[in-house]
Curated annotation (Swiss-Prot):
Protein name: Protease-associated domain-containing protein 1
Glycan attachment residues as annotated in the record: N171
Tissue and organ expression note: Highly expressed in skeletal muscle, heart and liver. Expressed at intermediate level in kidney.
Site keyed Not glycosylated: positions: N121
GO CC terms: extracellular region
Pfam families: PA
Signal peptide: 1-21
Keywords carried by this UniProt record: Glycoprotein, Secreted, Signal
Mod. after translation: N-glycosylated; required for efficient secretion.
Gene3D superfamilies membership: 3.50.30.30
InterPro entries named in the record: PA_dom_sf, PA_domain, PRADC1-like_PA
Protein function: Plays a role in the modulation of physical activity and adiposity.
Compartment(s) of residence: Secreted
Origin species: Homo sapiens
Length: 188
């Protein structure tokens, strides 16, 4: 009986390591916190692209989240200079998720957060997949609920700011539940 228990224990310890090593994702979430402007100082939930893009190898304590111009980021960006070495906030639509990610990567962005173009979407995450071309992208690509993207952009417009300051990724398991600052319009 003891060898059987040890075998099950090894399987339980081995399986998560195998899944992580092969990149299988089941309900994978990544969190980031807006530090400024203060009226949206919340922890937001995003989902990584399913089969393209990179991963975060480092935690950015303070990095700019720059809304792309034009918002759909399907071609040349008029504010591409500000996206270099920062993270771009892009809207869904007009071209594939991979195309948007490549545009941001070509402008030197460290990652892209693509928000749904349905601003009333406060609960449905879209699975971002490759567009069947042979192209690739190396930077992380995340999907954000439309309501969250809208609220971030609206706050920046109200304050006349060109970008938000965020911390990404955030380990929410180390934050006590009562300290998690969640957007009041989003269900967790």
């Amino acid at each position: 009986m003891v060898p059987g228990a040890a075998g099950w224990c090894c399987l339980v310890l081995w399986l998560p390591a195998c899944v992580a090593a092969h990149g299988f994702r089941i309900h994978d979430y990544l969190y980031f916190q807006v530090l400024s402007p203060g009226d949206i100082r919340y922890i937001f939930t995003a989902t990584p692209a399913k089969d393209f893009g990179g991963i975060f190898h480092t935690r950015y304590e303070q990095i700019h989240l720059v809304p792309a111009e034009p918002p759909e980021a399907c071609g040349e960006l008029s504010n591409g200079f500000f996206i270099q070495d920062q993270i771009a906030l892009v809207e869904r639509g007009g071209c594939s998720f991979l195309s948007k990610t490549r545009v941001v990567q070509e402008h030197g962005g460290r990652a892209v957060i693509i928000s749904d173009n349905a601003v009333d979407n406060d609960s449905f995450y879209v699975e971002m997949i490759q567009d069947s071309t042979q192209r690739t992208a190396d930077i992380p690509a995340l999907f954000l609920l439309g309501r969250d993207g809208y609220m971030i952009r609206r706050s920046l417009e109200q304050h006349g700011l060109p970008w938000a300051i965020i911390s990404i990724p955030v380990n929410v398991t180390s934050i006590p539940t009562f300290e998690l600052l969640q957007p009041p319009w989003t269900f967790w």
